[in-house]
Amino acid sequence: MKIFFAVLVILVLFSMLIWTAYGTPYPVNCKTDRDCVMCGLGISCKNGYCQGCTR
């Protein structure tokens, strides 16, 4: 069970790394720049979407 949990944690961490490095596969809606914090620092909200987060 510990091995399964360790593998699961590693998969989650790698998926989060890929998410932040390459953006999301779908547009992230926002109203202000503060809504784009999950995409990284300095990402701006333009036309209702986080620009640097969306592919």
Swiss-Prot record:
<keyword id="KW-1015">Disulfide bond</keyword>
<feature type="signal peptide">
    <location>
        <begin position="1"/>
        <end position="23"/>
    </location>
</feature>
<feature type="disulfide bond">
    <location>
        <begin position="39"/>
        <end position="53"/>
    </location>
</feature>
<keyword id="KW-0964">Secreted</keyword>
<dbReference type="InterPro" id="IPR036574">
    <property type="entry name" value="Scorpion_toxin-like_sf"/>
</dbReference>
<feature type="disulfide bond">
    <location>
        <begin position="30"/>
        <end position="45"/>
    </location>
</feature>
<dbReference type="GO" id="GO:0005576">
    <property type="term" value="C:extracellular region"/>
</dbReference>
<feature type="disulfide bond">
    <location>
        <begin position="36"/>
        <end position="50"/>
    </location>
</feature>
<protein>
    <recommendedName>
        <fullName>Neurotoxin BmP08</fullName>
    </recommendedName>
</protein>
<keyword id="KW-0732">Signal</keyword>
